[in-house]
Amino acid sequence: MELELRYSAEDISRIIEQALVYQCACPAQIATTLLELRDLFDYQVKCGDTDDTNRRVHEAIARATAEAHTRMERCLDEVLDIEGWDRNTLTMPEALRARPTKSL
């Protein structure tokens, strides 16, 4: 089982960096969630249980994680489009760079 990635780890790091520098939490929260889902997926896939029940448990978690990851990548696409990010450079638009600070 493989996880399909629309965004590389470097892309996600760039989004988080932009969001932290310019204090815009929403894209960073989604990006951080994607990294956490990737870690969870990797753990479930690599868990080498040979016991049938445990194997099935890990497969179920991996499948659900892959589905959540796909949905969150689509959500990130939508958020970046709505906010007007430059999709080639993953640069936040100027208008968002001056927003007041909210909790990251």
Segments and roles (model prediction):
Residues 2-3:
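A conserved regulatory-domain signal marking ACT and ACT-like small-molecule sensing domains
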Residues 6-21, 46-56:
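Short, charged/polar, low-complexity loop and linker segments
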Residues 19-31:
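Short, charge/polar-rich alpha-helical segments
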Residues 30-33, 37-40, 44-47, 57-75, ...:
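Amphipathic alpha-helices that form helix-helix packing interfaces
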Residues 62-104:
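Amphipathic alpha-helical binding modules
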